[in-house]
């Protein structure tokens, strides 16, 4: 497969996860999913950075992205394309990707708290990769992706994540650049 087509198809597949990962930074806040509770080690279970509002809007906008993808496929690519999962398929795929993304983010926060890292402290690789790994784990059993696409996503996602964090920091949407 041509590298450019491979890149496009991999990003097209994972786009709802990228959106779901970014939206809580903009629309999050409010009640944390751990209700402010501490784990048996005395540290917060997850922390203030993962909220119900951010989780809800992350999943919602991930699904909206999937719905938009469906209509883009129909309008510009035609129904006889590799990207045509159908409307219901896009809704399910985007829900799985968005849910996996936010679960991965929660798990990453949980692990960081176990290592006594506060919200906003950097945990290289963990910060950049858990969301994509869990997005793929949630979606892959129902919507498999070629191995070369998975490898490509595992390589480019940390770069995209890092770059988008710098942009969010410059736009004053994040307090730290990582």
From Swiss-Prot:
An example GO biological process term is:
glycerophospholipid biosynthetic process
The pathway that the record names for this protein is: Membrane lipid metabolism; glycerophospholipid metabolism
User: Catalytic activity, per the record?
Assistant: 2,3-bis-O-(geranylgeranyl)-sn-glycerol 1-phosphate + CTP + H(+) = CDP-2,3-bis-O-(geranylgeranyl)-sn-glycerol + diphosphate
Sequence intervals crossing the membrane: 3-23, 56-76, 87-107, 123-145, 150-169
Q: Which Pfam families match?
A: CarS-like (PF01864)
Q: Which cofactor does it need?
A: Mg(2+)
In terms of domain of life, where is this protein from?
Archaea
Gene Ontology molecular function terms on file:
CDP-2,3-bis-(O-geranylgeranyl)-sn-glycerol synthase activity
Q: How does it sit in the membrane?
A: Multi-pass membrane protein
Q: Does the keyword Membrane apply?
A: yes
Q: Which cellular components does GO assign to this protein?
A: plasma membrane
Alphabetical keyword list: Cell membrane, Lipid biosynthesis, Lipid metabolism, Magnesium, Membrane, Phospholipid biosynthesis, Phospholipid metabolism, Transferase, Transmembrane, Transmembrane helix
Q: Where in the cell is it found?
A: Cell membrane
Q: Looking at the keywords, is Iron-sulfur present? A: no
How would you classify this enzyme at the top EC level?
A: transferase
State which Enzyme Commission number(s) the record gives: 2.7.7.67
Q: Which HAMAP family match?
A: CDP_archaeol_synth
Biological role: Catalyzes the formation of CDP-2,3-bis-(O-geranylgeranyl)-sn-glycerol (CDP-archaeol) from 2,3-bis-(O-geranylgeranyl)-sn-glycerol 1-phosphate (DGGGP) and CTP. This reaction is the third ether-bond-formation step in the biosynthesis of archaeal membrane lipids.
The record's comment on protein family reads:
Belongs to the CDP-archaeol synthase family.
PANTHER family in alphabetical order: CDP-ARCHAEOL SYNTHASE
Q: What is this protein called?
A: CDP-archaeol synthase
Query: Which species is the source of this protein?
Result: Methanococcus maripaludis (strain C6 / ATCC BAA-1332)
Q: Which gene is the coding source of this polypeptide chain? A: carS
